[in-house]
């Protein structure tokens, strides 16, 4: 998984996943990234390859700032997997060329993410159950779930500045 950050203004790339039958994250906001391939040398290579495939951005190792904590789904209804997010800071905003897995993309400025009013519950109906999840309301579709959990520590650090 790649967090792609650009300056002027400081912004983060978010994608909305395409609607696909059987995909539990279908239609949700997220970050570029996906399954590792046997050809990948490691999860960093997976993040670089998947970002290139999904949004047409060729990330360079020199743009890698660091690795965030691994995140896994908390629901027993989701596939057992582990996501390792890598933070890349680019010198300028690249052209985004989404593939068929990406319905749309947007650049969200950090000011919006750290604004206290953007972080509030998102209500989801799961069958007969209604649940609330923490979410960033910075796009037409709230950013919640694993993506929210990836972003939260970073947003906390930025808000502390």
Predicted regions and their residues:
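Gly/Ser/Thr-rich beta-alpha loop segments that engage phosphate groups in nucleotides
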Residues: 29-36, 147
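Unchanged
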Residues: 21, 35-139, 143, 152-161
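N-terminal strand-loop-strand
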Residues: 1-31
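Buried hydrophobic packing segments
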Residues: 2-5, 147, 151-154
